[in-house]
Amino acid sequence: MRVHVVDPPAYTPPYDHALSSALAAAGADVTLVTSAFPYGEVPRGDGYRLDERFYRRSAGAPGGTLRRLTRLAAHVPDMLAYRRAAAAADVVHLQWLTVGQVDERLLPRRPLVLTAHDVLPREPRPGQVAAQARLLGRMDAVVVLSEHGRGRLVGEVGIDPGRVEVIPHGVLDHLTHVEPDPLPAELAAVEVPVVLCFGLMRPYKGLDVLVQAWEGIGDAELWVVGRPRMDTAALHATAPPGVRFVERFVDGGEAAAFFRRADLAVLPYREIEGSGVLATALAFGLPLLLTDVGSFPEVAATGAAELVPPGDPVALNGALAGLVGDPARRRALAAASAAAAAGPYAWGPIAERHLALYARLVG
């Protein structure tokens, strides 16, 4: 089975590489077709080819206007060139397509699968939701990461339920194999329990609720770590004692150090489907505190997490206080987290489920 895993903008490189490696280990002939990730080195797996053919002439700083414009200018010719190259694949498995209004006209003439990492855009531009629905309708199959996502695809988008396949987000364990860097001196000196909120800082992640919920939590620290994609001035202005911000892109050994130091991972999101941060925390066997959104309840059902309602600082405060003060409860959650990483969220069975889907499409 010749499989192309395709992520033109390189939005989820850890997932892309983990899936490609797992498919190759399960016997597929895999090529990951993507662009160079602009924020640092991405650890590669084994057994697959890497083709960074998209946006090779991008200019400007990552996230900047010039870079967006040069990538947009290259998008159509790069997609057309890939459509020709896709003739070498039995199945094309798309991860992200960023210009839906155009992409639906540029799809390869091969069996097509799309993983709906976001069922619908969270911050849609005019016409984007309709374009996404049309794009999903062009797929031979759509993979979603949870039963919640399946319900939305069928109920809100109108996708034929027979074309929707639920396959969870596998654990992202690449950082568990990385030698951790030393933490900055002011963080290395912290001796109390650390609650970690990691990843890009964006409005939908509920950081304002988390900072409000930290009020009154003693004998612990909250570390909010990641590159801001929002104005964080209000967070700093309202943060109670014990909150530290590390506002930059963190990866590699430094990211490993943060996850290894954490006593609890918190994801206070207002909405989400699947989460790479959650998949990484599972790989480290961390106890989890999650909001009741997207795929998170399915993770909590394994015993790895406690759940609180989204947007509820009072409930979040109570859960934080309870877990910070109860090491035995954290240990129980951590044991379940490690078991989930080795069980339902392990890449071996996830790859087999993908290959079974591909085989049905090829016939």
PLM segments and residue spans:
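Nucleotide-activated donor-binding/catalytic signature segment of Leloir-type glycosyltransferases, i.e.
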Residues: 233-256
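Glycosyltransferase donor-sugar binding loop
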Residues: 171, 198, 221-234, 248
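Conserved acidic donor-binding segment of nucleotide-sugar-dependent glycosyltransferases
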Residues: 302, 306-314, 322-328
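A short, well-ordered alpha-helix in the C-terminal region of glycosyltransferases
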Residues: 329-344, 353
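Conserved donor-binding/catalytic core segment of Leloir-type glycosyltransferases
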Residues: 187-205, 211-217, 222-223
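Acidic anion/phosphate-binding donor-loop and adjacent secondary structure
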Residues: 124-126, 154-155, 162-163, 170-187, ...
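N-terminal strand-loop element at the rim of the active site
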Residues: 6-74, 83, 100, 149, ...
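Acidic donor-binding loop of glycosyltransferase active sites
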Residues: 257-273, 283-286
